[in-house]
Amino acid sequence: MTVLKLSHWRVLAELADGLPQHVSQLARMADMKPQQLNGFWQQMPAHIRGLLRQHDGYWRLVRPLAVFDAEGLRELGERSGFQTALKHECASSNDEILELARIAPDKAHKTICVTHLQSKGRGRQGRKWSHRLGECLMFSFGWVFDRPQYELGSLSPVAAVACRRALSRLGLDVQIKWPNDLVVGRDKLGGILIETVRTGGKTVAVVGIGINFVLPKEVENAASVQSLFQTASRRGNADAAVLLETLLVELDAVLLQYARDGFAPFVAEYQAANRDHGKAVLLLRDGETVFEGTVKGVDGQGVLHLETAEGKQTVVSGEISLRSDDRPVSVPKRRDSERFLLLDGGNSRLKWAWVENGTFATVGSAPYRDLSPLGAEWAEKADGNVRIVGCAVCGEFKKAQVQEQLARKIEWLPSSAQALGIRNHYRHPEEHGSDRWFNALGSRRFSRNACVVVSCGTAVTVDALTDDGHYLGGTIMPGFHLMKESLAVRTANLNRHAGKRYPFPTTTGNAVASGMMDAVCGSVMMMHGRLKEKTGAGKPVDVIITGGGAAKVAEALPPAFLAENTVRVADNLVIYGLLNMIAAEGREYEHI
């Protein structure tokens, strides 16, 4: 795997904590002269070489690594009650403990093998565990149970509970994806592989754990302890030895209780940490979907309970893998010929969409002074199976104008305390603008992350929605036209055409245009910062922008902000919210 000698491993372990080390000390460890160290360092892997910084006779790495020395590991094991073995390179740490378990099962109990590189590292279902030297904390240990293998089906989730406890003790907020992945939102932090050997009337479970210590640049959708540590505003760097010792202490305590009491005492804790509890998921075998539904929880055996269209299902882990259901919401066919006309009654204009088979057939809009295009479309397209559903903030007079164009009663939907798995934290939901509510509901079609939902219309609203379905509220400010109108009416010298946006405007018109845009962008970025802090754990916070000024706002946001975050312009967001709502009604109808 590498051509590193023992001297390379000693020096690397000395530098792994990221603290400065004098070259004389490093040279003694490498058994060479200090002036030979630079050539010696060039033999390190490329991704390690670039981490070195030299200053005034001291070397340090710009980020810590998960690299150990045998003596330090032995002392750590003694404090934690484990025997230790260090393998700089091996096929698999699980294989090392499995071999020991077959030869001497009692010796395998609480013996831990830590490795830096694995040529055949694997996860559940034989998946390859990808890593580079120093990026991942990888270890395996044995635990002897006086139970047959079939009674240890919940060992995997209980090990995940122990790991999460340890990470929590270090100030890191981590979730569990059934059955045993450690995740931060959509990003995977670590995984657990359990293999068993039955011998002498006892079962030796070999627990293999891999946790990303630093962010692996060659792996997508990954999280790391180091990045979470920095996000949590902890001083200094994460320390791999502290992480490992904390994990061993928690694993020891949890497995002792598990051996005595089973999984039942841990169920509530697991439920609270389960990322997908109450959410839609897909369960796959060999890449094919075998179940889709909503996660209802796990039981005392670690079995997943799922609510599906066909009823309740129970799923053991086995060769099943779980994925969040990110497919766009569509409208189930409740009646073979049912169609919808969806209305978005804004302050200035009415928008509408004809929906057939769960998708927009046509989309239109008109000012309230002339709604004849809506009436013409109704005369052309309507039949006895069209249902009209709308959201309006335009006031009763304009709603009456809309009704005059249509020969069927409109169902105007208000804001509510809860819908589609989203809880509305507005103090008085009946006072909450329904457009803001349906914008939030519609945003779930474009992002399952926490997101800032921005609507640029007569007013600009900037709202916050968490990844776990809490609408937190938001701000309202005048839209671009109202800001310009206010300046024209309330000032003596600013009643002029707005110019263009510039970083440093030098004309009054340009200053007005730039100031208005800066106000909106600043409001968006401030809300994003608040939501980012509240969401925590390095989770992404997206920005979804809708309305007539959406494209201009997205273009005006700073390049650095755009590079670091997902910003998306979504037309007709209110109508998407209505579409999601009637889709949910369709699911309820089908279950009756």
Swiss-Prot record:
Residues 1-329 are annotated as: Biotin--protein ligase. GO terms for cellular component: cytoplasm. Residues 336-592 are annotated as: Type III pantothenate kinase. Pathway: Cofactor biosynthesis; coenzyme A biosynthesis; CoA from (R)-pantothenate: step 1/5. Substrate binds at Y426, G433, S434, D435, R436, T508. The keyword Signal does not apply. A monovalent cation. Ammonium or potassium. Residues 83-259 form the BPL/LPL catalytic domain. ATP binds at D344, G345, G346, N347, S348, R349, L350, K351, T458. Its cofactor is NH4(+); K(+). InterPro entries: aa-tRNA-synth_II/BPL/LPL, ATPase_NBD, Biotin_CoA_COase_ligase, BPL_C, BPL_LPL_catalytic, Transcriptional_repressor_C, Type_III_PanK. Keywords: ATP-binding, Biotin, Coenzyme A biosynthesis, Cytoplasm, Kinase, Ligase, Multifunctional enzyme, Nucleotide-binding, Potassium, Transferase. The active site is at D435. NCBIfam families: baf, birA_ligase, PRK13325.1. Activates biotin to form biotinyl-5'-adenylate and transfers the biotin moiety to biotin-accepting proteins. In the N-terminal section; belongs to the biotin--protein ligase family. PANTHER family: BIOTIN PROTEIN LIGASE, BIOTIN--PROTEIN LIGASE. This is Bifunctional enzyme BirA/CoaX. The lineage of its organism: Bacteria, Pseudomonadati, Pseudomonadota, Betaproteobacteria, Neisseriales.
